[in-house]
Amino acid sequence: DTFGTDAVRWYLMREMPTGADASYTLERFLARYDELANVLGNLVSRSTSMINKYRDGLVPEAASNGLDAEIDYALESARSAIERLKVHDAFAAAMDLARAANVYIEERKPWAQAKDPELASELDETLATLARVLVVLCALFQPVATEKMDELAVRLGLDQVPTLEKAVAEDMTGKKMSTGDPLFPRVHPESMDTTT
C-alpha cells in the first residue's frame, strides 16, 4: 500500500530483464522507487507548478522545442529495445528523457526568465518544451505505471493517456494544466515497518 502497484511493476521491469534471473532486495526496490520519485515525479511537479505560476496553467505557444533531439533519441531507443525484447532498456530510455528534462530546467532557469519581461519568449519555449516532454513521458511510462499516468494525463489537460504516436504529434498549446500531490511521494525507509 505504501508504494502502489505502479512502483512494483517499475521495479520488476527495471531490475528483472526478460529471460534472466533476478533477485529482490528492499534496498534495490527503494532505489528504483526513488528514481520514480526524484526524477519523474519531481519533473512533473516542477513543470506543472511553473506553468501554473508563470502562465496561469496554460501551455504557451513557442516557436521551437528545446528537447526535440532528446525526445527522438528516447523514442528510437525505446522502439529498438522493444524489438529486441529488452523491455527494461525501453523504460531506461524513458527515464533518461526525464533526466534530460530535469537538466534542461536547471540550464534554462525558468525562474530567472520569468523575472525579465524581455525573456518572455524564452520562458514560453522552456515551458512548452516541458509540456511536450511530459506528454511523451506519459505515453512511454503508461505500460508500467498505468494508474499514475492516468493521473498525469488529467494534470496535462488530456482526456486520457495518449498512444505514443498521438503523444508525439500532440499540440499542447493552450492546454490547461493542473497541479497536485506528488505522483510518487517520497518515502523515508526509517519510518517503514519491514517486519511484515
Protein language model features and the residues they cover:
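Secondary-structure capping and boundary motifs in well-ordered enzyme cores
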Residues: 3, 28-39, 63-71, 83-93, ...
